């Protein structure tokens, strides 16, 4: 039932109008399709992405023939073979975009062959909840020019009983922020992920977000909490070892730790992602010691879903949370190993989209299967709401099993 009979690779468009890789896998009784997303703010240690057209052309002769006849339900075997064919430690041979599309499509085909959803195929009987949505409301940094310095101002409905209600609340915060900007006479377009990208300072963004959260929390009757993705590697100047802000402020690594800790206290942030340079394990650790008891200190560029880097972070005490992006590491098995390592050491995990997304909903299934605390996949835009709507459906199925 799960033996691979045919594989198709094609180029499709992502949400930024760029070409990416989509894979289709057909088994005797199953079908799976998956697409590779792409990032704008990428860590220097991420798995290598190749030009989609060239990668697909090479894969036709170098990859696909080796996968025909393999058992798609043997995920470890599939992913080990992808590594073997590639022959590098970062998928620079076949391309991480080809690898992740094939790996996920294989898993979906195996699930389809046994007539169960992907989240159940991977998570089995242990799945009893869905991750809460971590939504991007105001954006800047690499996602939008002439906007905020920090890349993302986020919200998460920490007080909602059902994830469905949290998804709707995030959308209401998004709309309320627009209304507050309009009231102030501030025009705002949208960034790559659908967040508002107004020409305002970071302090003003914090104030507007706090006001919107208060209004929507009162309306919904449950708590909504703020967070940020600082994407601090983009602020860091390697030559001087300092963080340089657009307003002329220059902060040392120690000052950056103090600044972020003060923001956590001032605005009751419950989630801070990439607050320091992606090689600064000690700086992360200092912030984690200072604020990790009241806030998730999350590494994205620091860890890039890589077990070696996560282990390094564990040895330093650098963070209490790991962002998980399957395309950063290349396969479902590698993704699972990263999550397992983090959880074994008491760290939370957050499954995440990329700025360049497709309508693929796989991460909604992975977030449930691996019991991640949050799913970071935007608030609006078809490629974002596809995942959120799938999460609503999955949550219904989980409740039906209870």
UniProtKB/Swiss-Prot annotation:
Question: Which top EC class applies here?
Answer: lyase
Q: Which UniProt keywords apply?
A: Cytoplasm, Glycolysis, Lyase, Magnesium, Metal-binding, Secreted
Catalyzed reaction equations: (2R)-2-phosphoglycerate = phosphoenolpyruvate + H2O
Q: What is this protein called?
A: Enolase 3
Please give the SMART domains that the UniProt record associates with this protein: Enolase_C, Enolase_N
Q: State whether keyword Cytoplasm applies.
A: yes
- Which cofactors are reported in the record for this sequence? Mg(2+)
Bilayer-crossing residues are none
Q: In which pathway does it act?
A: Carbohydrate degradation; glycolysis; pyruvate from D-glyceraldehyde 3-phosphate: step 4/5
Role of this protein: Catalyzes the reversible conversion of 2-phosphoglycerate (2-PG) into phosphoenolpyruvate (PEP). It is essential for the degradation of carbohydrates via glycolysis.
**Name of the gene:** eno3
Q: Name one GO biological process term.
A: glycolytic process
Entry's EC annotation: 4.2.1.11
Which sites bind Mg(2+)?
229, 273, 300
Species of origin reads Methanospirillum hungatei JF-1 (strain ATCC 27890 / DSM 864 / NBRC 100397 / JF-1)
One cellular component term from this protein's GO annotations in UniProt: cell surface
